[in-house]
Amino acid sequence: MTNILSPEKSENDQELPIRPSYLQEFVGQQQIKENLSVFIKAAKSRNEHLDHTLFYGPPGLGKTTLAKIISNEIGGNFKSTSGPAILKVADLAAILTNLEKNDVLFIDEIHRLNTAVEEVLYPAMEDFELDIIIGEGSAARSVKITLPKFTLIGATTRLGLLSNPLRDRFGIPMRLNFYNTEELKKVLNRASKLLDIDLTDSGSEEIAKRSRGTPRIALRLLRRIRDFAAVDGKSRVDKEISDFGLKRLEVDRIGLDSNDYRYLKFIADNYNGGPVGIETIAAALSEQRDALEETIEPYLIQIGLLQRTPRGRVITIAAFEHLKMPVPNQSHHQFNIFNENE
């Protein structure tokens, strides 16, 4: 699923020029910033490595950026890979044996590591030792390699898919949450200065309100609206051109696009608001289940348009009102039951 409001990384995002390098430059996630600052200072004062850290939460909120910031703050090299890229134990061994003291190893989508790789990672995280088997059959022997003290930073959008043994080995688990409008305005204002965009306060607020609580989306929308302003002969990005551009991009006043409307209308039209299983929705919309669960549903849940229940997905009264559709009596009953049992 690829669209302007997808929180997933895109080749066109070009975040490097505006990516913050240190904690004091990072906007939002205040409690995480404050706690990380304490943990980093404490580790440096003891001349120790920072404990292994796990960032989890919806995509586009700054997990990769924070990992790079930690690397800068502790003065180590930054090595990056992803769960799907580590196919074999040998792949992991090659990465680990090339680390130096205080290096940061960042593994994105860490929930997608296979079991064999995970089991080799456990002693590397706990004891900084790599146990590998060399040879085959009767000639096989175990070799233990001592590793330098490094910090593993894992990132995942699906905490529930992480195995308990792996999750328990992270000393610093941190959940990243959606941004509010004021925080997104700060992100946009910082970026506008670095990108030399004349962004007014009203223009910033209009973009922020429709960015689904996600900095990556806000920055993407800012670039596209800058394009509309340039072609329209406007020197600044104000509320008027922001609203014009966002309408052209089919982003409504609360940040929904055509994919969100398809999702909500399917449940409303075909199941009177639900409940309906996610597999049924995915098949009907010709989308992957993972794409719906990671790209569409988190924001709909966050703003109160969708509920996940044991029986399936249920859209709320607020969703019917936003769709300008009458609320079926059955849907109203389900919504009340869900809240009473919660």
UniProtKB/Swiss-Prot annotation:
Transmembrane feature ranges: none
One cellular component term from this protein's GO annotations in UniProt: cytoplasm
SUPFAM superfamilies found in the cross-reference section: P-loop containing nucleoside triphosphate hydrolases (SSF52540), Winged helix' DNA-binding domain (SSF46785)
Binding-site positions, Mg(2+): 64
Tagged with keyword Nucleotide-binding: yes
Enzyme class: hydrolase
Positions of the UniProt region annotated as Small ATPAse domain (RuvB-S): 180-250
DNA damage in keyword set: yes
Region (Large ATPase domain (RuvB-L)): 1-179
Keyword terms, alphabetized: ATP-binding, Cytoplasm, DNA damage, DNA recombination, DNA repair, DNA-binding, Hydrolase, Nucleotide-binding
Function: The RuvA-RuvB-RuvC complex processes Holliday junction (HJ) DNA during genetic recombination and DNA repair, while the RuvA-RuvB complex plays an important role in the rescue of blocked DNA replication forks via replication fork reversal (RFR). RuvA specifically binds to HJ cruciform DNA, conferring on it an open structure. The RuvB hexamer acts as an ATP-dependent pump, pulling dsDNA into and through the RuvAB complex. RuvB forms 2 homohexamers on either side of HJ DNA bound by 1 or 2 RuvA tetramers; 4 subunits per hexamer contact DNA at a time.
Name this polypeptide is given: Holliday junction branch migration complex subunit RuvB
